[in-house]
Amino acid sequence: CYMWVVRGGEDMHPVHLYNFKWTRSGKNVLEFLDGFEGCVLQSDGYSGYDSAVDFWNENHPEHMLAHSNCNIHARRYFADAVKATGSKTAKEAVKIYEEIFTAENKLRNLFNDKKISETDFLRLRQEKVKPVFEKFHSWLLEKQQTAAILNSSKTAEAINYCLKRWDKLTNYLDYSFLTPDTNAAERAVKPFVMARKNFLFSGSGIGARSTCFIFTLIETAKANSKNPEDYLRCLFEKAPYAQTDEDWKNLLPWNIELTPFKMRGEWVE
């Protein structure tokens, strides 16, 4: 059994969707994409995402999807090589990634603080970050042969992982709403993992889907800076009266008005 977590929505209104599936098949990804109106899917290097996006693009030529990969996963291969072999080449790759992430964070902070426009943000990425990636690519090609000759399997694996996915690791630069990694989605997994240590089981597929429903509400509320307890209370109070699509939209975390809790009745001794 698998819990799939999808993060999406607008920058200011993120949504965390939890989905229960019996398998890890790439067909599940196609189900998640059904009705998707976005332009890019960002994921780790799992091949199921590759096949799903390829299938989607073959069958939706009018709505092609770009596919971006996570640079943290790529960096992790080099970090693992450092731990396993102490490879100097892998250490150098980790340093290059730190340079990329540092530059990205500085630009993202300026953009989030509205000190630069979206146009300037994308332009500065091309000026500050893209050249580092280009040097990194040349460096990887140079080191690829050396790593193979030295039979540094961990380092060679890390280099090949990056080169194989190079376009998908760097195309995020063209989208202001994308970061170099999938950390935000990865962080959304942690609350479920921690909670599962307490409740242990969902009992059935229906129970697991109910768990997904509640986690979607709670974690989306938290992602939008809403107290989840207050949000759920107001949601459950107002949902029975929702009749139109507009009514339901007004119950989304970024639209709902959280009314103060009022105690009804009195305690009787």
What residue ranges belong to the model's regions?
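Catalytic center-proximal scaffold of phosphoryl-transfer enzymes
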Residues: 1-269
